[in-house]
């Protein structure tokens, strides 16, 4: 039968062939049995095989009929659907004829749709997919793409003949194929024709359809097409063209029923806008889509997304060629004309910049354009601009009820974000925030996104002045960053000039124009505008200034500038004088600018112009132009284009007599260059002299401007160039002409240098307005002096050098006594000579020719001192009854040991040098011995002295104790100087006892001798100490007395190293006063105990211990003094003379205190002493002598300090004179009288001077008269010695009178008298006393200007010319006289330079505590207090007393008395001084100020100080190698402050949180994490701090993940997300290992894993819904992607490169905007991160090294999208889908497994 059928098939008749197919079908059914379905496993019968074979026949009738037969078998249920379909698909690849097969597939699909769709009630879209169960047509097309015409034919028939009831199902079953055809990423060209042709078929209008709504089929097709649009590829020209056609066709179809398709039309309009941009970039054409948009506007009207499209149009216009602009302009006009109430949206102002760009370029472009119908581009642009300028704006922004979920390009995200930001920026504070953020990003941005330019232009056009200055600033900086948009901005600025504004704003806009000349291409445009302005006569001055500014940017404008300057010189009759004046000033200013900017290029060209202006402007009211050109000349001289001397020679005829203040000021500024341009020629030196004279003359000018300029110019000159001849006559001292100057010698050799004190006299001549300039001048003097300060001055000041300016007579005393000592043969004279030797023994130092000491002679000198020391220990006489010697003997030993120690030390070093020279020692060994020589000498002297005292008399032991105590002080000072030299602690030497232990041993020895019950803590110098078996002290009375008085020598050591001993010693000495239970049995010892306590207290006063100690120490001092005074005035006590002397010593030093309480106390006790003298007639002569001496000392000190008046002092002096007259043989009375006369004389008491002139000749006459009684002669000797200042050390008098030649003559006369007595007198006792007094006088004369304190109390050791010394003297005067006599304003002028220069230099040693304490306590005001503290702070490093005083003022109660500014300074400067005060003081400062200011409830709570406190704390924590205790305190303070900071962060307080983060930055990770641990109560501040640390790279990014688990449960998660967004962006900007791209990528991948765990509920959270938690985490993911993809999105969003833009809260007052992350701008920024995520993700994954992780990102997106339904909100799912679709340009997306999954197939 098969053969028969075959023959029928071959018969060429269609009827026969058709019948044959019927027979074949019947045969198939017969062979297979009618009851069984044909399926895959059915036996292949001949008939069935033939049927399949003929389906591919070349005969169209046969193959068609066979294919239809197969379909019929399926339809009649004789064959399985899958069997037939698969069979057909198997045939397709190999057959030549596919028509029948494809038609059969269509029929099968229609049948399947009918069967499965149930009449459209069931969705059958999922029957087929694209990949796993592919649609049959996809399979066919992939195998036979050449069959596309058959496809087109069959698909056309399929859709056109689709039964109405099957329309929905048919579209659903065809959907996978259509998705594949149009969305396949490769967009194969083989399918292109099918795509295009089929689209017309799909979208052709239905002939019979309802006018109101489309047919079901049309609805289904159009909805499918709308869904396809976001997946279209727009990468290249072909793809873009196809996509454009697709979207346009879809839009046209939608427009047939605009009401029905309103939402889709709106969305497609936006898609069309987006794809227009791509089309414009790739094809240069977009008019068709623009016309479509215009049609949509007409139909949609108010439903059209006007504002978004306006933004899009603005962007398009900026990049559209002229030929494409007309349609866009028409569209814009249409958009603005369809708005209701004729009110246009404010966003229309965005069009201003593009419109102006068109208008400004029309003339050129119209030349090359083809004539077109209708209005021209220019007319359209003008119409549009006119419409926008009507300012009839809608109040509200258009509300969008729709949003494109999946836009076809990234443009939509940009315009939507721009629209949202524009919406918020109606508030000026939000606009200011955005501008500040943009400004912060410009330095790191190379290309500025066009939307940002548009927004800026919008702000520029709209702003009425609130933010205009900021906008112009950002515009300028934006032009610097990206010059490509400058041509667009220039017309906007010109447009803004036409709007009504404040005049100053017009000026700002005009001067912004030249700043935009950042590229040569922009210059022409700007130049034309400026030239246009110049055509208006009134604007020519401004034009010249603008041209000059433009020239500063681009030198190529110089010819034009020159031309315009020349034109401006031409006089014009049409303008008034005012305009001419403006032109002249403008020209002068331009000359100045040219000279300043490019002096070498064009400076020479300006000389003629400068000369012209100077010649023309000579009138008083023409000073301004002349001054301006002189400033230009200043620049030329500075650049050395012209010679300043030659210039002045040329100008001086015109200007030397000029009196105009402005000219004089400018000339002074010009002359400030003279020092820096110095030339080594006589002419220049003469010129400099002339200039100095000019400047000094004008310092006294009545005009403050001139005087200020003169002083400021003088500050540039060297201090040595000023002479006393320059000073004003009123303060000019007499020229010192030396007596020895011969007549024929040159007078130029006279010293004309200015004494430092003379500069201070300028204060009295200087008006208040000139004081600041004088202050600058003083600062210059101080700085120069410190720069040139000899290094040796620091050491000599600490060691105490001898005065070098004493007369020859005084200098000859030591040699005289030494000679007497060496030639003496009288044993009775030996003790006296030894005493004299003690006071003044010294051996001259010999130097080689090159000025270096000779080692051999140094060694010899050291040996001489060693031998003399041992001799003096044995020979110096100690007599307990000699009260006068007891006072001075300790000081004599101290002075001697100072000389001896340094001489022996130098000798030791000399010996070592000799050993090295002779090769007796190795260099290393010698070096070690030299470094330890100071300790070797100490121990050698200690051994020698203790051995000498071992078995000798009590006198020797007493001398030894005084010598060792002095040695302790001397070595301690030497150690201090070594420490300052080595800038730190000295290295511990293992072979020597440490200084601390050695000093402790000496001290314990003294204390054990004074008090046998004292328990020493270490070893003792056992040679001295003998204790009986009963435990009683067996030391001699002399030893006990010497030990007690020696304690006073150690006061400087106590204060520096062991202040705690002071209380112990005071208590010990007080307990042993006469009349006390513990008083010594020996009467002499009781006397010395009182004296010792007085000496000890006086030394404490001298060291200003009360100023640098706490309240407890002051109370103890007063308590001890009270006890001493009680003994002094207790008439029942017999042995209280020592107490009287002690009180005298204390009161003498207390007089110099600035505390009113002390001064009152001194005055009261002085009167009490005076009365006591009156009542002492019945007392012993010694008692009376002591009392008189004490009264003289206290009276002198009180008068010198201004405590008593001259009359009261005179009364006391007369009282003592009467005592002397009544008892002329009493030495004590004569001593007292001589002392008071001397003291009052040097303090300016005229009557005392007169009395002294009478007393001295009388006493000398008594001494030199033969036969005078010895006692009378002795009294006269004491009196005349006192009369020339031998007792000055007791009172520490300071006076210039001591240095007068008159006084020097009296001193010489006394010395000659004493030497004559010693040489001639035959009375041993008289000789002995005379020698002792001569030595005593020598020592007191040498130390008259030196303090015994551990550091000098002033700078008298500096030369007379020292300004610093004079300034410190002024401090002292201020401290003594108070603000009534020394005005604070003048004191500030002197103090400020000292404080300012002190920041860079350490001053020579001085007792800052003594200087500054009075100024701090007296009412000088806040400014002086702060300057005092500044000096303490800067000098605390090198001055222990400055640090001690500072320690007092930074702790309660004194710190509470300081002003707010002073506290602020202390807080900020804490890092400079905090290491130099005690731990207790640091604690007090930290607790009572640094932390207290953060406590709102605290009385100290002060928000103004909080930033300063944290700044100081953070800087203090950066100090290198802090002590453990200090670090602990600072760390603890950081924790406390962090806890006190509010959780919600106010914008104005942001700096505090940054500062606390900087503190944590210095800590270890564990400490920082402990303090900033994130909890629910502190989450915002802790999160911010951690985020800041992460952004700076201090913490790794992984810390964020831990924080997120807490953040997700926070109610205001958005605030935290906003912080995270900024932190992540800043982490990208900061260059750090922890924020590098690999670290960031690692963290983001980890975060993605964490989010996956959350989505699949591997991680759960309490009190937070899963979908909300996932939304938050996806937001965080989005922030990271947007922040790290590029700089465009962050710039548009208003992200900042730092936190500073958010620091100032400049919005309207309100609780929400004032907090960080809560303002409308902040919220929009965060929301729009999600909008920009898709585009940012695509950008990120195209960069290295991110692109390597693309597959991981895609897989992750799929895993989250496919998470359980309840885990992901609809919005998040849409976002992730859009993100996936944005990746369709990537190679990884083109894998079928990826893109089919992404499209949902």
UniProtKB/Swiss-Prot annotation:
One of its GO terms (cellular component) is focal adhesion. The keyword Cytoplasm applies. The modification N6-acetyllysine is found at residue 819. It is found in: Cell junction, Focal adhesion; Cytoplasm, Cytosol. Changing residue 1177 to R: In SCOLIV; uncertain significance. Ubiquitous. High expression in brain followed by testis, muscle, pancreas, heart, ovary, small intestine, placenta, prostate, thymus, kidney, colon, liver, lung, spleen and leukocytes. Expression is reduced in most glioblastomas and all glioblastoma cell lines. It holds the Pfam family DUF3730. InterPro entries: ARM-type_fold (IPR016024), FOCAD/RST1_DUF3730 (IPR022542), Focadhesin/RST1 (IPR045163), Focadhesin_C (IPR021392). Signal peptide: none annotated. One of its GO terms (biological process) is regulation of post-transcriptional gene silencing. It comes from the Eukaryota. Keywords: Acetylation, Cell junction, Cytoplasm, Disease variant. Required for the maintenance of SKIC2 and SKIC3 proteostatic levels in the liver. May be involved in the regulation of RNA degradation by the exosome complex. Potential tumor suppressor in gliomas. It is linked to Liver disease, severe congenital: An autosomal recessive disease characterized by severe neonatal liver cirrhosis and progressive hepatic dysfunction. Affected individuals have feeding difficulties, poor overall growth, and failure to thrive with signs of malnutrition. Additional features include jaundice, abdominal distension, hepatomegaly or hepatosplenomegaly, and ascites in most patients. Interacts with VCL. This is Focadhesin.
């Amino acid at each position: 039968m098969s053969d028969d059928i075959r023959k029928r098939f071959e018969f060429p008749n269609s009827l026969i062939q058709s019948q044959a197919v019927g027979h074949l079908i019947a045969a198939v059914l017969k062979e297979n049995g009618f009851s069984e379905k044909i399926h895959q496993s059915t036996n292949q019968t001949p008939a069935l095989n033939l049927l399949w074979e003929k389906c591919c026949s070349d005969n169209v009738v046969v193959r068609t009929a066979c294919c239809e037969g197969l379909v019929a078998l399926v339809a009649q249920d004789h064959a399985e659907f899958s069997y037939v379909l698969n069979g057909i698909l198997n045939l397709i690849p190999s057959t030549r004829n596919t028509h029948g097969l494809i038609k059969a597939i269509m029929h099968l699909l229609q049948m399947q749709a009918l069967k499965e769709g149930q009449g459209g009630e069931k969705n059958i879209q999922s029957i087929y997919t694209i990949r796993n169960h592919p649609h049959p047509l996809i399979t066919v097309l992939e195998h036979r793409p050449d069959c596309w015409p058959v496809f087109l034919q069959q698909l056309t028939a399929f859709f056109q003949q689709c039964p109405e009831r099957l329309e929905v199902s048919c579209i659903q079953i065809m959907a996978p194929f259509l998705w594949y055809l149009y969305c396949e990423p490769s967009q194969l060209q083989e399918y292109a024709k099918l795509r295009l042709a089929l689209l017309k078929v799909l979208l052709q209008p239905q002939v019979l359809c309802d006018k109101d709504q489309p047919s079901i089929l049309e609805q289904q097709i159009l909805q499918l097409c709308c869904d396809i649009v976001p997946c279209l590829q727009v990468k290249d020209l072909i793809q873009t063209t196809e996509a454009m056609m697709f979207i346009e066709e879809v839009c046209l179809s939608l427009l047939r029923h605009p009401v029905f398709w309103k939402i889709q039309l709106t969305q497609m309009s936006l898609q069309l806008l987006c794809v227009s941009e791509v089309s414009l970039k790739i094809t240069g054409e977009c008019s068709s889509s623009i016309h479509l948009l215009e049609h949509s506007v007409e139909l949609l009207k108010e439903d059209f997304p006007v504002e978004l499209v306006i933004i899009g149009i603005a962007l398009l216009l900026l990049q559209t060629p002229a030929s494409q602009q007309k349609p866009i302009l028409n569209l814009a006009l249409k958009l603005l004309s369809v708005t209701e109430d004729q009110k246009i949206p404010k966003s229309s102002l965005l069009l201003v910049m593009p419109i102006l760009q068109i208008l400004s370029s029309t003339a050129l472009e119209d030349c090359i354009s083809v004539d077109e119908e209708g209005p021209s581009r220019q007319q359209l642009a003008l119409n549009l601009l006119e419409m926008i300028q009507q300012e009839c704006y809608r109040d509200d922004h258009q509300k969008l009820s729709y949003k494109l979920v999946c836009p076809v390009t990234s443009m939509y995200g940009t315009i939507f974000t721009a629209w949202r930001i524009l919406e918020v920026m109606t508030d000026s504070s939000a606009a200011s925030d955005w501008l500040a953020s943009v400004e912060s990003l410009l330095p790191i941005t190379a290309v500025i996104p066009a939307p940002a330019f548009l927004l800026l232009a919008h702000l520029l056009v709209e702003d009425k002045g609130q933010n205009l200055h900021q906008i112009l600033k950002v515009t300028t900086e934006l032009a610097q960053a990206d010059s490509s948009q400058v041509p667009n901005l220039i017309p906007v600025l010109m447009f803004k000039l036409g709007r009504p504004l404040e005049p100053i704003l017009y000026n700002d806009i005009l001067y912004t124009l030249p700043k935009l000349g950042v590229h040569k291409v922009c210059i022409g445009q700007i130049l034309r505008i400026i030239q246009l302005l110049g055509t208006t006569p009134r604007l020519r001055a401004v034009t010249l200034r603008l041209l000059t500014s433009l020239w500063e940017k681009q030198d190529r404008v110089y010819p034009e500038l020159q031309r315009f300057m020349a034109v401006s010189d031409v006089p014009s009759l049409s303008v008034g004088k005012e305009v001419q004046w403006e032109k002249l000033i403008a020209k002068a200013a331009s000359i100045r600018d040219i000279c300043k900017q490019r002096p070498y290029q064009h400076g020479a060209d300006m000389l003629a112009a400068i000369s012209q202006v100077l010649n023309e402007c000579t009138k008083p009211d023409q000073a301004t132009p002349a001054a301006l050109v002189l400033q230009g000349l200043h620049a030329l001289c500075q650049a050395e284009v012209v010679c300043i001397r030659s210039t002045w020679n040329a100008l001086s005829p015109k200007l030397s007599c000029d009196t105009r203040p402005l000219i004089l000021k400018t000339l002074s500024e010009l002359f400030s260059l003279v020092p820096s341009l110095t030339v080594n020629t006589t002419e220049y030196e003469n010129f400099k002299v002339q200039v100095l004279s000019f400047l000094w003359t004008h310092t006294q000018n009545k005009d403050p401007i001139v005087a200020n300029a003169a002083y400021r110019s003088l500050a540039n000159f060297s201090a040595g160039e000023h002479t006393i001849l320059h000073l004003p006559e009123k303060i000019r001292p007499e020229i010192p002409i030396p007596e020895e100057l011969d007549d024929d010698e040159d007078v130029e050799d006279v010293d004309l240098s200015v004494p430092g004190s003379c500069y201070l006299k300028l204060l009295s001549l200087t008006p208040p307005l000139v004081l600041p300039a004088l202050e600058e001048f003083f600062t210059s003097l101080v700085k120069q002096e410190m720069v040139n300060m000899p290094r040796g001055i620091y050491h000599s000041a600490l060691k105490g050098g001898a005065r070098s300016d004493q007369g020859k007579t005084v200098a000859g005393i030591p040699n005289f006594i030494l000679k007497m000592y060496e030639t003496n043969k009288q044993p009775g004279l030996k003790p006296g000579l030894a005493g004299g030797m003690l006071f003044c023994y010294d051996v001259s130092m010999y130097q080689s020719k090159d000025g270096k000491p000779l080692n051999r002679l140094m060694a010899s000198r050291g040996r001489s001192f060693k031998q003399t020391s041992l001799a003096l220990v044995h020979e110096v006489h100690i007599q307990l009854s000699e009260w006068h010697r007891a006072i001075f003997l300790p000081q004599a030993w101290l002075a001697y040991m100072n000389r001896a120690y340094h001489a022996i030390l130098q000798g030791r070093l000399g010996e070592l040098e000799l050993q090295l020279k002779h090769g007796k020692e190795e260099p290393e060994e010698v070096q070690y011995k030299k470094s330890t020589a100071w300790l070797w000498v100490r121990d050698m002297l200690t051994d020698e002295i203790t051995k000498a005292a071992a078995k000798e008399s009590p006198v020797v032991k007493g001398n030894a104790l005084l010598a060792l105590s002095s040695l302790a002080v001397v070595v301690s000072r030497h150690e201090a100087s070594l420490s300052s030299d080595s800038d730190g602690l000295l290295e511990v030497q293992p072979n020597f006892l440490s200084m601390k232990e050695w000093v402790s041993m000496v001290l314990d020895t003294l204390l054990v001798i004074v008090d046998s019950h004292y328990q020493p803590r270490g070893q003792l110098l056992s040679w001295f100490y003998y204790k009986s078996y009963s435990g009683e002290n067996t030391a001699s009375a002399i030893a006990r007395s010497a030990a007690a008085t020696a304690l006073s020598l150690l006061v400087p050591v106590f204060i520096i190293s062991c202040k705690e001993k002071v209380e112990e010693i005071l208590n010990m000495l007080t307990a042993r006063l006469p009349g006390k239970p513990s008083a010594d049995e020996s009467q002499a010892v009781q006397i010395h105990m009182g004296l010792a306590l007085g000496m000890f207290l006086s030394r404490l006063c001298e060291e200003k211990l009360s100023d640098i100690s706490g309240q407890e120490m002051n109370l103890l001092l007063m308590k001890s003094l009270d006890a001493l005074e009680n003994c002094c005035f207790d008439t029942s006590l017999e042995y209280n003379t020592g107490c009287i002397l002690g009180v005298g010593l204390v009161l003498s030093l207390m007089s110099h205190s600035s505390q009113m309480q002390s001064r009152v106390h001194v005055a009261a006790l002085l009167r009490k002493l005076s009365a006591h003298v009156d009542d002492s007639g019945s007392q012993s002569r010694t008692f009376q002598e002591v009392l008189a001496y004490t009264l003289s000392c206290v009276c002198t000190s009180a008068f010198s300090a201004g405590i008593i008046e001259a009359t009261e002092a005179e009364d006391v002096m007369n009282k003592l004179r009467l005592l002397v007259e009544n008892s002329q043989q009493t030495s004590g009375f004569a001593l007292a009288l001589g002392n008071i006369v001397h003291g009052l004389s040097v303090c300016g008491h005229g009557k005392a001077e007169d009395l002294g002139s009478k007393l001295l000749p009388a006493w000398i006459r008594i001494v030199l008269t033969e036969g005078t009684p010895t006692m009378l002669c002795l009294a006269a000797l004491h009196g005349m010695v006192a009369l020339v200042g031998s007792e000055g050390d007791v009172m520490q008098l300071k006076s210039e009178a001591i240095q007068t030649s008159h006084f020097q003559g009296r001193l010489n006369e006394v010395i000659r008298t004493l030497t004559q007595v010693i040489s001639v007198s035959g009375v041993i006792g008289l000789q002995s006393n005379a020698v002792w007094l001569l030595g005593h006088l020598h020592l007191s004369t040498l130390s008259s200007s030196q303090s015994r304190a551990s550091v000098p109390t002033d700078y008298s050791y500096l030369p007379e010319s020292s300004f610093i010394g004079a300034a410190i003297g002024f401090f002292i005067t201020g401290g003594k006289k108070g603000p009534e006599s020394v005005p604070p304003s003048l004191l500030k002028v002197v103090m400020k330079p000292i404080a300012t220069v002190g920041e860079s230099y350490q001053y020579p040693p001085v007792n800052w505590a003594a200087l500054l304490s009075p100024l701090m306590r007296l009412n000088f005001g806040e400014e002086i207090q702060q300057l005092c503290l500044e000096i303490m702070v800067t000098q605390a490093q090198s001055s222990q007393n400055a640090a001690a005083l500072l320690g007092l003022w930074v702790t309660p109660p004194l710190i509470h008395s300081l002003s707010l500014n002073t506290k602020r300074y202390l807080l900020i400067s804490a890092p400079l001084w905090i290491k130099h005060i005690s731990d207790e003081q640091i604690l007090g400062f930290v607790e009572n100020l640094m932390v207290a200011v953060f406590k709102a409830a605290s009385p100290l709570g002060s928000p103004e100080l909080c930033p300063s406190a944290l700044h100081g704390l953070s800087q203090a924590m950066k100090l290198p190698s802090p002590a453990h205790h200090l670090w602990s305190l600072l760390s603890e303070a950081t924790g406390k402050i962090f806890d006190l900071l509010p959780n919600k962060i106010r914008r104005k307080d942001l700096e505090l949180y940054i500062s606390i983060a900087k503190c944590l930055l210095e800590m270890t990770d564990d400490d920082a994490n402990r303090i900033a641990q994130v909890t629910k109560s502190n989450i915002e501040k802790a999160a911010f701090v951690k985020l800041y640390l992460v952004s700076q790279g201090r913490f790794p990014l992984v810390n964020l993940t831990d924080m997120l688990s807490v953040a997700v449960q926070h109610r205001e998660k958005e605030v935290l997300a906003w912080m995270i967004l900024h932190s992540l962006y800043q982490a990208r900007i900061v260059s750090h290992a922890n924020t590098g791209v690999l670290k960031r990528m690692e963290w983001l991948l980890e975060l993605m894993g964490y989010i996956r765990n959350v989505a699949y509920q591997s991680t759960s959270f309490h009190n937070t819904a899963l979908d909300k938690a996932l939304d938050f985490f996806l937001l965080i993911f989005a922030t990271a992607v947007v922040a790290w993809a590029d700089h465009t999105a962050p710039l548009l969003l208003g992200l900042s490169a730092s936190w500073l833009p958010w620091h100032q809260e400049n919005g309207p007052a309100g609780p929400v905007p004032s907090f960080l992350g809560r303002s409308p701008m902040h919220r929009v920024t965060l929301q729009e991160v999600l909008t920009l995520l898709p585009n940012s993700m695509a950008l990120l994954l195209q960069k290295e090294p991110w692109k390597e992780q693309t597959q991981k990102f895609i897989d992750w997106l799929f895993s989250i999208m496919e998470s359980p339904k309840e885990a992901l909100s609809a919005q998040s799912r849409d976002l992730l889908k859009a993100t996936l679709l944005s990746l369709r340009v990537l190679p990884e997306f083109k894998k079928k497994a990826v893109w089919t999954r992404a499209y949902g197939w």
